Structure formats: structure tokens, C-alpha cells
From Swiss-Prot:
Region 8 X 8 AA tandem repeats of X-T-P-X-K-K-X-X: start-end pairs: 57-134
Domain of life, source organism: Eukaryota
Subcellular location(s) per record: Nucleus, Nucleolus; Cytoplasm
Pfam assignment, any one: RRM_1
Sequence repeat start-end pairs: 57-64, 74-81, 82-89, 90-97, 98-103, 104-111, 119-126, 127-134
Main location, first listed in the record: nucleus
Residues modified to Asymmetric dimethylarginine: R656, R660, R666, R670, R674, R680, R682, R688, R692, R695
Organism encoding this protein: Mesocricetus auratus (Golden hamster)
Protein name: Nucleolin
CC terms in the record's Gene Ontology section: cytoplasm; nucleolus; ribonucleoprotein complex
PTM per Swiss-Prot/TrEMBL: Some glutamate residues are glycylated by TTLL8. This modification occurs exclusively on glutamate residues and results in a glycine chain on the gamma-carboxyl group.
Modification type Phosphothreonine: residues: T68, T75, T83, T91, T98, T105, T112, T120, T219, T368, T406
Length: 714
């Protein structure tokens, strides 16, 4: 109670001393009085700062603290400032740092209270020193609070000292804005008591330290002003410093972000030149498109520079066209083979090499083990590089050859031949061969010069192939043929007889064919072709009814067509016989280049193939070219026979539209239909017509195609 009274008295005197001017130093007596006042009120000196940190001190304490601190309690550890203003500002800041943390441990109260420097006055309803609180009023408020604090001071002093020592090393946590918020929150009386006791003990320690140093002499007015302006300002400065630090950090972060953004923009700007402008890009894209197209045209659309072409496979597609051309030419150049041009496919996996001569081409084909960029290349003659029409125009058909003839022997006769292909069956030569030349002119020249030449004891017969040969057949003219038939049809032939057997009998025959069934057995008849009508007529007269292998044969002239298979006028449809039972319509169609569809005649009851069918083309020219190419060819291992299909209306058995029982020509169905016997068609029971009805259905009359006629043998 005595201390509180003294404190109140001191504050009253402080009020009276406010008017005098600022004084830096006073008499020694005044210093002693100030020290005595510090003794009486020293306990409250640190209270406001403790309160500021704890937000639990009363306003009176806070006012006294700031005054006493400013007047007589300079910070012992810190340097005393010369000017009172600086001292006042410095002292509370330093004091605020240490006690603020000291209270945090024992009290363990809310963080908001500990952080607020100006929070205390709000609790008691008193105005804070920053707002110009009067010392007299604060002293009165202090009396009511101090009564409860005196009893507990001594008991808690030891604990508080330990707490203070521990807490002095902890950094202060000061937030100006948080202090304002904490000022609004009320604190309990128990908290005030504990904190007051701690502050009193701290004040005593500060008094001892202040005696050793020189006391600052400040007038009461100065002391009064100090709490109002200095303490909150200092608190504000600390908070502002923290805010400034935060703002600086934020500014630094923003600066870093801006720098990153600038770097990204710079990178984008650097990348932008790489991306072409829309117009430029469009041009480049056009160029990119044009290059492959030009390359493609060069490879696929270009004609070979020479007729001596070589196919090369298994190239390295990872290399460029230029690299491949150089690498492909090198191995041939090392072998003294002149390469005219090298063409590669668009995928660069294959290519073609054009040579100057057929000799170079043949030598190139003999080379083995050639490697290009590590890949062993495949060498062979190109397949289908030239159209069959072009190849047929420069190809001759050689007949009446010895069955023992070889390609080398023919090569000696036809020296300028580009390719020679012997026709064989079951590994045995059939006595015919196809001889291809460089050009159509060379083929014509050889036909004139080598016609009838003797090869291995036999006179060879040469014929044109392709369209030129078809025209000659229609006109009945060929190099050695007359308008008369040069083919004999031989019937009642022994099933064991072979073409070799017949060749021994008919020595002048240029072509002999013995048709076989699906099992490879003879059908009992044959076609024998001669070089001239006179030879055919002579054979007919001398060999008719001759016995061959136990059977008497019958001979007759086939007709003026000059070919065993040319028994009717050309059309858009080919008749194919001798098919295997396993042959499908798809296989049949694929066997004839240029065909549009194919159909195989099957048995109505069993559904099995009858061994023949029809192949349609878009034009007669396509049909002729296909017929010539497949002459004496094989399908699924069976040798097939080709003929022109009969035009509509000429066949019996209802043509394609009628069923087998109709006999009604074109329109008859199975029930007889319109025609009766013969109907509208020319033939009666003859003709090869469609036995099954075909596309026209059972009712007949559909969009049927013409068929060939049936050859009848006695």
C-alpha cells in the first residue's frame, strides 16, 4: 500500500512538472529524488512493456513504466542515448524484447495478448498512453490493481526470475497490428496478478542496474510525453519493421517472379523466330509436300531409260535416295557393268537398275552376295514392270522345237534375245518357247530372218504374240500360214499316249497338245498344229485311222483359224477348262490380268466344280492380252485350256439364262420356258451354255454373258 501511495504521489508531481522546458540535466538533488521515485515506482517500470508483450498489464502500470523507464531506468546492457527522446525510444524497445518473452512461459496465455504492446489499457477501460492518457488517472487505476498483487509478490519472485532468465534468450515476437486486435480481448484478473508480480521483480533488477549507470534527467513533462509518443511509437516501429520486412520479402518474391516471367518471355521470343510465320509456314509446307510428290513421280512415274532393268530388294530404308544410288552403283561398277540409272521406291526398300545392254543385265544377275549398307541385296528380273501388251509386242513364239532343246542353244540362234522362256510340264519341255527382244523392231527382224531355221534337227516355226498375232489370226495370215486350217483334231487317242509319242508320228507338227483332266490323265484327244495347211493336209491323208498304242485314231481339220484354241470369234469373255476342283472364283480371276469377274460352273446337286469357268473383261483387247499371256498356263497346278466364249443366242441348253431342263434357248427356265427345242437360239441341243442357270437365275433372261461352244469329238 505504501508503494502504491508513493506511486500516486509521484505521478501527481509529474503532472506539475510538465510545463517547464526540456532539460537534459538537473541538480544532483533532483537525480537523487528521481532515484527514490524509481525505488517507489520501479516495480511498475517494466510493467507496461511486460504488459505490452503480455497484453495483461493495467494502463496505470503502463504509463508509470514508460515514465520511470524514461526518467531513471535506462537499459543497463545497452548504451544510454544522449538525447532523451532517443533514450525513451530505445529503452522500452529493449525492455519490451526481454520481458515480453519472459511472461510467455509462466502465464502460457493467448499469443495475441503476448504480442500486443498497447493491448493492456483496453482491458481496464483506460486510455492507452499513446492516446494521451493522464498520469493521475493511471495512478488511481493502479491502486485498485496493486492491492491484490502485493501479497503474492514474494512467493512468485523466485519462479519469475528463473522464467525471465530463460526467456531473455528467446527472440521477441512483435506484431503491431496484432497488438491492436489483442487490445480488444479482455484478460482475467488472475493473469493480471501473475504478470504484475513478475514485472515487479523485473523492475527491482532494473533499479539495481540503473544505480551503476548515470541516470537520465528528464522533466516530468518529458516523462509524460515519452509514454504517449515514444512507447507506442516504438511498438509501432517494431511492428512496422516487421511489416516492412514482410513487404520486402514480398517485393523480393515479386521481383523474382517478374524476373522469371521476363526470362520465360525471352525464351519464348527466342523460340518464336524458329516458328515460321503463317505465310512462310504455308510455303514451307507446300515445299515439303512438293518434294515427296516429285520424288514419287520420279520413282514410280518415270519410265526406265533402257529395257535392261534389274530389280533390287532388301535395301536399307534408313539411307537417303542419293546415298542408295551411289552405294548401289558401286558394286556393279567394280564388275565393269555400266549403270545408266538407279531408281528407288518411295519407301527406299527396293529399287531398279537400268543397264546399257542385255549382256550387262545377265552378268548382274549372276552376281551374288552383294551388300549395300550392310544388307545383302536381292537381285532378280523385274516382274510386271512393263505392261504385257508392250512385252508381247516384242516377243515371238517359237514352236516345233526339240524336246531336248535348252535356253543356251536357243541363245546361240537368237543372239540379240533379251530373255528366253521354255514352256515345260512336269519338268519336261513341250517343244515351244517365248523369245523376248529389246524392241518390236528386233522381234520382227528375227521373225523374218530365222523363220524355218533348223535347230537341233527340227525346223522352227515363229509367230507373233499379243495384238499383232491376234490380227494375223483373224486375217488368216502369218509368216508361214495360209488362209487354210493348219490344225488337226485327233480323237480316240489312247489314254496312255503322250505328246512325245505323237511328236514321233507327226514329225512336221509344230505344236501338239493333249488335254488332261483334273487327275492329270489324258482326255483321249489331242490337237496337232502344223506350219502350213499343206503339211496339215498331208498328215491328215497319211495318218488318219492310224493305230497308236493299240487304238485307231481319227483325224480331221479343225478349221481355218490356224490355232488349236482359236475356234470362235474374240469376245470379252474367255472360256477356261481344265480347272482343279480346288480352284475358286477369286483364284481364277486373279490368274487373268485385267479381268473384272470370274465364275466357275458347279454341279447343281453336289455343288462341286465341273472343271471349267468363265472370265469376263472390260474389252476384247484386254481379253486377248490375257488369253495370250495365259496360253498353256497353269492354275492351281492344272494346265488350263482357253477359248473364246460363245456370243449369246448361239448356244443350246437355254444359254446362260436357262436351266438344264429348259432347252429353251435364251429365255427358258427349268420348266421349258418360251423357246421349246431351239427356241430363239440358233443351236438346238448343242452349245456349251450354262448348265446351272448362272447369274440369270432359274427364270432365265438375266444380264448373262456369252459363252463358247462345245467341241464335239467322235
Amino acid at each position: 500500500m505504501v508503494k502504491l501511495a508513493k506511486a500516486g504521489k509521484t505521478h501527481g508531481e509529474a503532472k506539475k512538472m510538465a510545463p517547464p522546458p526540456k532539460e537534459v540535466e538537473e541538480d544532483s538533488e533532483d537525480e537523487e529524488m528521481s532515484e527514490e521515485e524509481d525505488d517507489s515506482s520501479g516495480e511498475e517500470v517494466v510493467i507496461p512493456q511486460k504488459k505490452g508483450k503480455k497484453a495483461t498489464a493495467t494502463p496505470a502500470k503502463k504509463v508509470v513504466v514508460s515514465q520511470t523507464k524514461k526518467v531513471a531506468v535506462p537499459t543497463p546492457a545497452k548504451k544510454a542515448a544522449v538525447t532523451p527522446g532517443k533514450k525513451a525510444a530505445a529503452t522500452p524497445a529493449k525492455k519490451a524484447v526481454t520481458p515480453a518473452k519472459a511472461v510467455a512461459t509462466p502465464g502460457k496465455k493467448g499469443a495475441t495478448q503476448a504480442k500486443a504492446l498497447v493491448a493492456t489499457p483496453g482491458k481496464k477501460g483506460a486510455v492507452t498512453p499513446a492516446k494521451g492518457a493522464k498520469n493521475g488517472k493511471n495512478a488511481k487505476k493502479e491502486d485498485s490493481d496493486e492491492d491484490e498483487d502485493d501479497d503474492d509478490d514474494e512467493d512468485d519472485s523466485d519462479e519469475d526470475e528463473e522464467d525471465e532468465e530463460e526467456d531473455e534468450f528467446e527472440p521477441p515476437v512483435v506484431k503491431g497490428k496484432q497488438g491492436k486486435v489483442a487490445a480488444a480481448a479482455p484478460a482475467s484478473e488472475d493473469e493480471d496478478e501473475e504478470e504484475d508480480e513478475e514485472e515487479e521483480e523485473e523492475d527491482e533488477e532494473e533499479e539495481d542496474d540503473s544505480e551503476e549507470e548515470e541516470a537520465m534527467e528528464i522533466t516530468p513533462a518529458k516523462g509524460k510525453k515519452a509514454p504517449a509518443k515514444v512507447v507506442p511509437v516504438k511498438a509501432k516501429n517494431v511492428a512496422e519493421e516487421d511489416d516492412d520486412d514482410e513487404e520486402e520479402d514480398e517485393d523480393e518474391e515479386e521481383d523474382e517472379e517478374e524476373e522469371e516471367d521476363e526470362e520465360e518471355e525471352e525464351e519464348e521470343e527466342e523460340e518464336e523466330p524458329v516458328k515460321p510465320a503463317p505465310g512462310k509456314r504455308k510455303k514451307e509446307m507446300t515445299k515439303q509436300k512438293e518434294v515427296p510428290e516429285a520424288k514419287k513421280q520420279k520413282v514410280e512415274g518415270s519410265e526406265s531409260t533402257t529395257p535392261f532393268n534389274l530389280f533390287i530388294g532388301n535395301l536399307n530404308p534408313n539411307k537417303s535416295v542419293a546415298e542408295l544410288k551411289v552405294a548401289i552403283s558401286e558394286p556393279f561398277a567394280k564388275n565393269d557393268l555400266a549403270v545408266v540409272d538407279v531408281r528407288t521406291g518411295t519407301n527406299r526398300k527396293f529399287g531398279y537398275v537400268d543397264f546399257e545392254s542385255a549382256e550387262d543385265l545377265e552378268k548382274a544377275l549372276e552376281l551374288t552376295g552383294l551388300k549395300v549398307f550392310g544388307n545383302e541385296i536381292k537381285l532378280e528380273k523385274p516382274k510386271g514392270r512393263d505392261s504385257k501388251k508392250v512385252r508381247a509386242a516384242r516377243t515371238l513364239l517359237a514352236k516345233n522345237l526339240s524336246f531336248n532343246i535348252t535356253e543356251d542353244e536357243l541363245k546361240e540362234v537368237f543372239e540379240d534375245a533379251l530373255e528366253i522362256r521354255l514352256v515345260s510340264q512336269d519338268g519336261k519341255s513341250k517343244g515351244i518357247a517365248y523369245i523376248e527382244f529389246k524392241s518390236e523392231a528386233d522381234a520382227e527382224k528375227n521373225l523374218e530372218e530365222k523363220q524355218g531355221a533348223e535347230i537341233d534337227g527340227r525346223s522352227v516355226s515363229l509367230y507373233y504374240t499379243g495384238e499383232k498375232g491376234q490380227r494375223q489370226e483373224r486375217t488368216g495370215k502369218n509368216s508361214t500360214w495360209s488362209g487354210e486350217s493348219k490344225t488337226l483334231v485327233l480323237s480316240n487317242l489312247s489314254y496312255s499316249a503322250t505328246e512325245e509319242t505323237l511328236q514321233e508320228v507327226f514329225e512336221k507338227a509344230t505344236f501338239i497338245k493333249v488335254p488332261q483332266n483334273q487327275q492329270g490323265k489324258s482326255k483321249g484327244y489331242a490337237f496337232i498344229e502344223f506350219a502350213s495347211f499343206e503339211d496339215a493336209k498331208e498328215a491328215l491323208n497319211s495318218c488318219n485311222k492310224m493305230e497308236i498304242e493299240g487304238r485307231t485314231i481319227r483325224l480331221e481339220l479343225q478349221g481355218p483359224r490356224g490355232s488349236p484354241n482359236a475356234r470362235s470369234q474374240p469376245s470379252k469373255t474367255l472360256f477356261v477348262k481344265g480347272l482343279s476342283e480346288d480352284t475358286t472364283e477369286e483364284t481364277l480371276k486373279e490368274s487373268f490380268e485385267g479381268s473384272v469377274r470370274a465364275r466357275i460352273v458347279t454341279d447343281r446337286e453336289t455343288g462341286s466344280s465341273k472343271g471349267f469357268g468363265f472370265v469376263d473383261f472390260n474389252s476384247e483387247e484386254d481379253a486377248k492380252a490375257a488369253k495370250e499371256a495365259m496360253e498353256d498356263g497353269e492354275i492351281d497346278g492344272n494346265k488350263v485350256t482357253l477359248d473364246w466364249a460363245k456370243p449369246k443366242g448361239e448356244g443350246g441348253f437355254g444359254g446362260r439364262g436357262g436351266g438344264r431342263g429348259g432347252f429353251g434357248g435364251r429365255g427358258g427356265g427349268r420348266g421349258g420356258g418360251r423357246g421349246g427345242f431351239g427356241g430363239r437360239g440358233r443351236g438346238g441341243f448343242g452349245g456349251r451354255g450354262g448348265f446351272r442357270g448362272g447369274r440369270g437365275g432359274g427364270g432365265g433372261g438375266g444380264d448373262f454373258k456369252p459363252q463358247g461352244k462345245k467341241t464335239k469329238f467322235e
